[in-house]
Amino acid sequence: TLSSSSAASDVYKRQVNPGAPVIFGSFASSMSMQTGAPTFGTPEPAKVLYGCAKLARRLGVPFRSGGSLTGSKTADAQAAYESTHTILPTIMGGTNFVLHSAGWMEGGLVADYAKLLLDADQLTMMPKLVNGIDLSENAQAMDALRETGPGQHFLGSAHTQANFEDAFWRSQMADNTTFEQWSSEGSVESSARVQTRG
C-alpha cells in the first residue's frame, strides 16, 4: 500500500501541476501488540524501507525516509540500538532525503538535546561508512610495509604518523578512556557527558 499510495499521489500531482518535482517517501514501523505503540529498530520496517528505496530508484525519483528513530523516553541503550537499527537501513538503502535524523524520541513525541548530540555525532560516521574502501596509493600503505620489518609494529612508521589523525572515524562524544580513568573522573554516562561537550 505504501507504493500504491505514493504512485497515486504522483499521478494526481502530475494531473494538477505537470512537471512539478516529486519525492517518494515512506514511514514504516512495527507495533507492540501489547500496547499498540509503534516500535523502532526492528527488521520488518527496514525491509519496507529497502523495497521502497528500490522502487523510487526504478521510478527515477528521489527517496525520503526516516532516520534515528526510537520509542525510548530517554537517551539510553534502547535509544542507541533502536536509532542505530533505523539510521543504518536509511543510509544503506540510499535514502536521498532523511527526516528525523537526530534527537527524535518516544515515537516522535519528544525531541531530546542529549540524543540530538549523540545522533549528530553518529551521523558524522555515515559518509565514512558508505564511501567504500579507499584503494588509493596512500591507503594501501605500501611504503609502511616496506619500512616496517618482521616482528615490528607500524605505530612509529612515517605513514602512520602522517595518517593517524584521520585514518579512523572518531566519535566526539564517546569515552575511550580506561575504566579506572573514567571512574576517577566521576563515572559520567554518555547522556550526561554530551551536555558538557555539546
What are these regions (language model features)?
Residues A75-Q78, L109-Y113:
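Histidine/acidic-residue-rich catalytic or RNA/ligand-binding cores of hydrolases
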Residues A79-H85:
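Charged helix-capping and loop-helix junction motifs
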Residues R14-F40, C52-K73, G93-G108:
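Core alpha/beta catalytic barrel or barrel-like domain that forms the active/cofactor pocket
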Residues A114-G198:
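Catalytic-core signal marking the mid-to-C-terminal active-site face
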Residues P45-A46:
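N-terminal, Lys/Arg-enriched amphipathic/low-complexity engagement segments
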Residues T1-A8, Y12:
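Single conserved hydrophobic/aromatic residue that forms the stacking wall/gate
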Residues F40-T42, E82, L116-L117:
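Short, hinge-like loop/turn segments at secondary-structure boundaries
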